[in-house]
């Protein structure tokens, strides 16, 4: 025990020396990163007690952002193992000192990985910023930072997109970064070196393997990535009456609007696993690594390997609970409507994750926040209707956004008369009008839904 404690202390000291947040009681340098790896270096007094709110103000001043940016962006502590948005009252230095404890509590990482992990401060979008409010922003620098973050998430596969959407986004990115289309300057040869900054590299790799055959021009022949992006670049609409600055703002908003169609836009990501359906002659099953995204609108479960949605639910469509049968196995339960062999059922999905507690708390807070700020008129706007039609169309086309229930193992229940027999975890909270007191009985499955 003594040896392990000494090792942990030594690792923590090394971590603090290497960290982007330097310790000390005098004026010290602090490094904050933007999503595009741009660095902001600040000199601050009282680093050990400075709050995220105070540091946020210094960053806004360094970037010459207006005070309205206070609600648009937040400070995050980021590492490959965990991402945490800091509250304004949090003290980043103290959270850094607790980082190893947070990793031990909320990840399954080995002791060695925990000791080697080093977080850094990042200035990025606040997950509690409503999309409608985002589109009201008129400051170009704020829109640029939001665009850079959205593009990063698309390129890295954190925001899985259909090929057709990537084409549109790539064309808009060309316009924003290369200026208005000029047929003499902008050719496939000029686009080719920039392709990995315009189009998700993982889709390019899939196409090389023959999986992407949807890149076709109007003549029906397969087009190159360069030509496809160039075609959408040509189609970006220009308004001659507006200034260059206003044109840039308009195109930033076009890019963001397109990303708003993704159910996980502006979310916080968590890591977990779900049960795979039993497959093969031996009826083998296992677990699938997933990312769970939580934002103001709902929860999405994304296949980390295939980069497509397994299930996406808005808050009116789900109930949830967090349980921990034992200390090392926390579970987030999602309950939603479905059907089994034509029979309407309630489905329970188990997500195994030591971050289930964080997910549950964030879901609850997002629902409370949405209910306190929602506008009845906004729910029935033409834009929302068009978005619903768009998503329905995508599902018919086997979009990456469509639910893939066949890839999930769920526990199914049906209503059973007037008597109440609780056969599922008791929910921590109930926010939905559809959640009257019900009686459920288990659907007898042909195979056991639990792990084998």
UniProtKB/Swiss-Prot annotation:
Residue stretches of biased makeup (Polar residues): 373-387
Domain of life: Eukaryota
PROSITE patterns per record: FERM_3 (PS50057)
Subcellular location: Cytoplasm, Cytosol; Cell membrane
The FERM domain, residue ranges: 28-374
GO CC terms of this entry: cytoskeleton; cytosol; plasma membrane
InterPro entries found in the cross-reference section: Band_41_domain (IPR019749), FERM/acyl-CoA-bd_prot_sf (IPR014352), FERM_2 (IPR035963), FERM_central (IPR019748), FERM_domain (IPR000299), KRIT1/FRMD8 (IPR051594), PH-like_dom_sf (IPR011993)
Protein name: FERM domain-containing protein 8
Naturally occurring in which organism (per UniProt): Xenopus laevis (African clawed frog)
